[in-house]
Amino acid sequence: MEHHIGCMDVDVNNNIKPTELIKCIQETANGQMNARKPSYFELFWDRKSFIITRFSMEIYEQIHQFDDIETRTWTAGERGATFFRGYEVMRNGRCVARASGDWAVVDTEDGHIYKTKEIDLSNYESGDKPELNINEKFRIPKNMEMEGCGVHHVVLSECDMNMHMNNTQYANILWNQIDGILDKEITSFNIKFRAEAKFDSDIMIMRGVPAVGKKSKSGEKANAADGSDANHVNSDDQNQDGLIIPKYGDRAADELAVFRTETGGKTNVEAVFGLRVIKR
């Protein structure tokens, strides 16, 4: 699917905002469903809906206003109750971003989760699961100190037909809470969905922003992939207080921003951004 990036899609540094990029990606999957069947609506009227449990994205080159991009998607296997999906974003024949998503199908009335063998997606284009550098199964350590940084009220314009906040919205909401974001660009985004946020509910946002990748366990500076000296995130991804996101793997990042949100007394999402300081 082709997309033209406009002035409303980019931030003050002329880089595409995370939610806008994810919307391009997810709309491509929606288009595939509509063309190949079953469509979103066919599933919905049969009391079924896809819910996302995990989304991981790497951005290799920033996307700007007036860029024309092409988004591609495919089903990438299944296991148990989880369908895997791959995504690529192309610009001028180059892959500028790649992503992976984990999805399940639920009954929209009673919450029953279907096994993959009960849902026929054989008409969809399929391929291999993308190999990402970042750790898709990251964990926020229990001892990482998190500080409250905001409350977001879920409004109707953010919700999908299930009356929950659409998964694409979270990226911008959390991105807005990153310290010093005016001088940074995103190299990766990784999010786990734990509980849905209903329309008219409040989301409590908690933040921990570790300065990572400065040193490895041995005290040596981390090196870039080409062996050069760099402040890249290494396998010990560690902040100033010794708190760790184990083996996060974003070697393009200078630091990470870590978030956890809650709604209705439950953990809502957990997310990590890889960030690079913009050289001016």
Report residues per predicted region:
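Hot-dog-fold acyl-thioester-processing enzymes
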Residues: 1-52, 98, 107-187, 267-270, ...
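HotDog/MaoC-like acyl-thioester-processing domains
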Residues: 1, 58-59, 63-139, 197-199, ...
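Residue-level marker for the onset of beta-strands and adjacent loop->beta junctions
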Residues: 53, 83-85, 187, 203
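Glycine/small-residue-rich hydrophobic helix-like segments
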Residues: 174-210, 261
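Short structured motifs
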Residues: 53-59, 71, 188-193
